[in-house]
Amino acid sequence: MNISDPLGDMLTRIRNAQMRGMSKTTSPASKLRARVLDVLTDEGYIRGYAEIEKSGHKTLEIELKYYEGQPVISEIKRVSKPGRRVYSSVSDIPLVRNGLGISILSTSQGVMSDNAARAKNVGGEVLCRVF
């Protein structure tokens, strides 16, 4: 199966698994996906993830997080897509729900949250937003 948007596929897998109340989900591994999951873990949106190798293929096993039976992530949405890339300078990085959520950016200094990008004074491609 050919996936045209691998990051969007992972975000959809997370969204679908949380709607079903699952504790874990899997996604094919890549460096970008792992860096996005690092940000989600650091910000407290998921419990963590592990890279597992099965029959020569690496997959990411993502542990989802719930609070009082409800998913911690109420919205996870792709912003920059393969057909329409969205870039933002440091002064134009969007606030998600007046600062209650985060944007995840791919910058020249790596993948990071919007708050980290503002602190390091760098802009970049807005990959997704999480609330």
From Swiss-Prot:
MF terms (GO), sorted A to Z: rRNA binding; structural constituent of ribosome
Keyword Aminoacyl-tRNA synthetase among record annotations: no
Record-level GO cellular component terms: ribonucleoprotein complex; ribosome
Highest taxon, organism lineage: Bacteria
RNA-binding keyword on record: yes
UniProt keyword terms in alphabetical order: Ribonucleoprotein, Ribosomal protein, RNA-binding, rRNA-binding
GO biological process: translation
InterPro entries named in the record: Ribosomal_uS8, Ribosomal_uS8_CS, Ribosomal_uS8_sf
Role: One of the primary rRNA binding proteins, it binds directly to 16S rRNA central domain where it helps coordinate assembly of the platform of the 30S subunit.
Assembly, per entry: Part of the 30S ribosomal subunit. Contacts proteins S5 and S12.
Family stated for the protein in its record: Belongs to the universal ribosomal protein uS8 family.
NCBIfam families (alphabetical): PRK00136.1 (NF001109)
Protein name as catalogued: Small ribosomal subunit protein uS8
Organism of this sequence: Hyphomonas neptunium (strain ATCC 15444)
Taxonomic lineage from the root: Bacteria, Pseudomonadati, Pseudomonadota, Alphaproteobacteria, Hyphomonadales
